[in-house]
Design a protein with these regions (language model features):
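Aromatic- and glycine-rich beta-strand/loop motifs that create alpha-glucan
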Residues: 1-26, 285
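Terminal transmembrane helical anchor/hairpin motif
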Residues: 6, 14, 31-71, 192-285
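Secretory targeting signals
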Residues: 33, 122-180, 184
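Long, hydrophobic alpha-helical segments
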Residues: 73-100, 197
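Short alpha-helical transmembrane interface motifs in multi-pass membrane proteins
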Residues: 76, 88-91, 127, 131, ...
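Hydrophobic/aromatic residues in alpha-helical transmembrane segments
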Residues: 87-94, 142, 177-178, 224, ...
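Transmembrane helix boundary and interhelical loop/hinge segments in multi-pass membrane proteins
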Residues: 91-111, 125
């Protein structure tokens, strides 16, 4: 009963950020599709024609696929605005789990409650995962509203974009787990946020090097962001990958990428729980 009350408290604390984030994603998705409807098809072809050679190495699909309405809308799931909104949720909620509570003085009250320390970590992860799912759903819902209200030539099916929304949700869970892990080691909320941002930037640089470096696929595989390819999952939903030690066994990327991200998020959260259960809690300054 006490755990359920804590879950409700966590939802109450996060409800404004979650509501505003969902509204932004729904509105931006509609706006993005509306702007696409204003662009002449020939302009996309001209942009791709004059794009530098390294651009093709940075995109996970063929340029021809980007000329279709589905390819153009798929850019939405890689756009900086949805990424920033989802990162804001992941880093904001993840940093609050331990370090944020210590800094605000709430941790002393929670530790003195009948709940065990492990239970104190369960409520935040319920809110974080639920919020990540709702954010992905909000972006997909905005896509559906846009396709339903904006006139496009040869409009794609809205269900084609579900893999992209799921991949974005998985990335949000992964980033939240990484942030929570850093938060479990600290007592100031801002340091976990900056730390998680630094980890993400390094992962992005490693992925970029792997994409541009000839034969650098193994370098890209060192970055967890290599598993974030919503555009590829939207345009090539049945693309597969052969396992290194089992060359005859192929796994569809839409399952593999999301599994990697969610697993990384859950394992980092589990490590954060282990650290929090065993650490001494400092007095808030």
């Amino acid at each position: 009963m006490a755990l359920l009350s804590l879950v409700r408290f966590e939802f109450k604390e996060a409800r404004f950020q979650l509501a505003i984030s969902c509204i932004i994603l729904i509105s931006f998705a509609w706006l993005f599709i509306w702007l696409i409807s204003l662009i002449k098809p020939g302009l996309w072809a001209a942009v791709l024609e004059f794009a530098p050679d390294f651009f093709q190495k940075l995109i996970a699909v063929s340029p021809a696929q980007l000329l279709t309405p589905r390819g153009q809308i798929s850019v939405l799931y890689l756009h900086i605005v949805p990424l920033l909104v989802c990162m804001g949720w992941a880093l904001g909620r993840g940093s609050q789990v331990v370090a944020g509570r210590i800094a605000s003085g709430h941790m002393e009250l929670l530790v003195a409650s009948p709940l065990r320390r492990l239970e104190l970590m369960i409520a935040p992860v319920v809110v974080i995962v639920t919020g990540a799912v709702l954010l992905g759903l909000a972006l997909w819902l905005g896509t559906w509203i846009g396709l339903s209200t904006v006139r496009l030539s040869n409009p794609p099916e809205v269900f084609d974009f579900i893999p992209g929304a799921v991949n974005l949700t998985a990335l949000t869970i992964c980033l939240a787990g990484i942030t929570t892990l850093i938060s479990s080691l600290d007592q100031d909320r801002w340091r976990p946020i900056w730390g998680a941002m630094a980890v993400t930037i390094v992962a992005a640089i490693v992925k970029l090097i792997g994409q541009l470096l000839p034969g650098g696929g193994w370098v890209a595989n060192l970055s967890f962001l290599t598993a974030f390819e919503p555009q590829k999952l939207i345009l090539e939903p049945h693309a597969s990958w052969n396992l290194p030690f089992f060359p005859h066994l192929a796994v569809e990327l839409r399952f593999w990428f999301n599994l990697v991200l969610v697993f990384l998020g859950m394992i980092t959260y589990a490590i954060a729980c282990w650290i929090f259960v065993r650490r001494d809690l400092p007095v808030p300054r």
